[in-house]
């Protein structure tokens, strides 16, 4: 489903025929993600030619194959109880954040990427054009400020004992600049003080290094929990072709140096780099997984799924077997070279994301399953009611 998407037209018919939905409402229905058995959350990508589809039988949702076999049960993922809240400047939360599963908050604080202006954008990316193709999604092209991000996290903490956040942005016009990073980290440190590493607000920032290697330490000193400098592709030839802006303005050597330097400050398990499975040969992708793991860097293996508005729109991703074999090999490497990834302690105390709620891929679902970990969401649960009363909150 991550690779080839889902057919949704049959589901829309079921919604009108058996669930009493208005035809127009059903026709426009596009759910963002699904919850599958064993607490696996997955993004939904509509594809009218997909091998799988969603159907409703006896008021229950199922994934069905092309010959009408029921593959597994499924559930839509509801919004958290604070989703209709407003920030202190009266901006609706739906303009600030996207929810992944029940534990992860996903912020893109700036959808503008200057590489699109200079024609050096990452070839797989549709970050800036996405606004034209997905107007119904709960995202906004407007820049989100530090206080708004902190307001959402503050609200999440009232209903969830340990919410995690992923923060990303496009490359700013000053391509070597920090692009709002400093302001967000200063706001988070003020709103959520910490006295040790594990008390830092669990935020994973996926940003570009700058030309100044000292900025790696600067961002750490400002209180960031975890950092991801994404390779996207590991092979150096593909790197130049697929991520020309990163190659031109930062360069591969400095990118690698920034990752290695980050481990010195954050420690193993808090530095990440994403690589897209299917964008390059498996051999070089696996070389990238090994390169990262050997240096204490956690690989994020993301299945290639061509995006509308990107240079790869209309391309076919690899087969399911290729993708599964690649993920299994990558997971084996991760568990062998980063053994802490196979412990409940890491996922509960140190990981900046919830493995089950990470909808950008399924590598961590495989890692946890192969390690025999079954404490889904690290024992955390999103509550329908506040964890503390308004009275207790005002006293604290």
Model-assigned labels for residue ranges:
Residues 1-65, 286-396:
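Auxiliary Fe-S-binding modules of radical SAM enzymes
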Residues 38-123, 127-141, 346-348, 362-370, ...:
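N-terminal [4Fe-4S]-dependent radical SAM core
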Residues 110-112, 133-147, 203-210, 278-280:
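Active-site mouth loops of central-metabolism enzymes
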Residues 118, 145-149, 184:
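Generic hydrophobic, aliphatic-rich segments that mediate packing or membrane embedding
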Residues 121, 138-146, 237, 246:
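Short, flexible helix-coil linker/hinge segments at the edges of structured domains or between repeats
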Residues 129-167, 386-388:
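Conserved alpha-helical substructure of the radical SAM core
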Residues 135-144, 192-200, 335-345:
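Intrinsically disordered, low-complexity coil segments
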Residues 150, 154-160, 168-315, 322, ...:
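Conserved AdoMet/S-adenosylmethionine-binding subsite of the radical SAM
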């Amino acid at each position: 489903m991550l690779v080839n998407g889902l057919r949704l037209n049959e589901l829309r018919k079921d919604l009108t025929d058996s669930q009493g939905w208005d035809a127009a409402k059903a026709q426009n229905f596009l759910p963002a993600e699904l919850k599958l058995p064993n607490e696996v959350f997955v993004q939904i990508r509509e594809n009218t030619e997909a091998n799988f589809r969603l159907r409703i039988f006896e008021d229950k949702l199922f994934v069905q194959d092309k010959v009408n076999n029921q593959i597994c049960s499924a559930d839509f993922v509801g919004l958290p109880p604070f989703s209709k809240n407003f920030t202190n400047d009266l901006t609706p939360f739906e303009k600030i954040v996207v929810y992944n599963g029940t534990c992860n908050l996903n912020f893109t604080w700036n959808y503008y990427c200057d590489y699109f202006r200079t024609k050096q954008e990452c070839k797989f990316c549709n970050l800036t054009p996405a606004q034209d193709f997905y107007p119904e999604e709960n995202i906004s092209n407007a820049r989100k400020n530090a206080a708004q991000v902190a307001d959402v996290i503050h609200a999440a903490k009232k209903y969830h004992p340990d919410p995690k956040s992923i923060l990303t942005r496009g490359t700013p016009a000053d391509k070597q600049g920090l692009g709002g990073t400093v302001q967000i980290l200063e706001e988070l440190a003020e709103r959520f003080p910490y006295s040790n590493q594990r008390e830092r607000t669990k935020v994973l920032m996926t940003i570009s290094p700058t030309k100044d290697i000292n900025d790696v330490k600067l961002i750490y000193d400002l209180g960031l929990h975890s950092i991801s400098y994404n390779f996207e592709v590991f092979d150096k030839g593909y790197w130049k072709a697929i991520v020309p802006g990163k190659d031109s303005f930062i360069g591969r050597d400095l990118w690698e140096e920034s990752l290695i330097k980050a481990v010195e400050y954050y420690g193993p398990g808090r530095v990440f780099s994403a690589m897209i499975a299917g964008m390059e040969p498996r051999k070089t992708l696996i070389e990238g997984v090994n390169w990262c793991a050997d240096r204490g860097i956690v690989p994020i293996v993301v299945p290639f799924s061509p995006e509308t508005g990107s240079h790869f729109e209309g391309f076919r991703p690899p087969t399911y077997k290729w993708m599964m074999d690649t993920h299994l090999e990558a997971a084996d490497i991760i568990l062998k070279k980063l053994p802490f990834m196979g412990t409940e302690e890491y996922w509960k105390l140190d990981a900046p994301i919830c493995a089950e709620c990470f909808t950008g891929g399924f590598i961590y679902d495989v890692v946890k399953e192969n390690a025999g970990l079954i404490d889904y969401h690290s024992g955390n649960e999103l509550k329908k009611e506040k964890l503390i009363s308004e009275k207790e909150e005002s006293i604290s």
